[in-house]
């Protein structure tokens, strides 16, 4: 397994309308699922700040070994599933305490 939960990766993110664009994303699936099935759940990171009810604002102090060049937001209502071998190697990692808050915001946003 080359990626883990909380990793920041770069991936061709496929949106609900079928369009695709390279974006940063956070691996949200747990390591057991990645290992056993070979696929990952990802949540979108973008510099767009619309739909504030559904985003989690990021800052560089929330991240290990990586810096965003622009203000960035996790779009907690936009997730994607893809195969592990499709995503880039980890670029950095979200610190655990912030990842837990992001997961809670995903749950709030979707359920």
Where do the language-model regions lie?
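Compact nucleic-acid interaction/catalytic patches
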Residues: 19-62
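Short, charged beta-turn/beta-strand-edge "cap" motif at the junction between a beta-strand
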Residues: 14-18
């Amino acid at each position: 397994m080359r990626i883990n939960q909380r990793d920041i990766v770069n991936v061709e993110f496929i949106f609900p309308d079928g369009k695709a664009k390279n974006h940063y994303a956070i691996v949200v699936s747990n390591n057991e699922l990645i290992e056993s099935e070979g696929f990952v759940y990802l949540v979108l990171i973008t510099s767009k700040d619309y739909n504030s009810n559904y985003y989690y604002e990021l800052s560089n102090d929330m991240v290990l070994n990586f810096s965003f060049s622009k203000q960035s937001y996790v779009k907690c209502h936009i997730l994607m599933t893809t195969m592990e071998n499709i995503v880039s190697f980890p670029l950095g990692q979200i610190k655990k305490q912030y990842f837990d808050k992001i997961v809670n915001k995903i749950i709030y946003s979707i359920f």
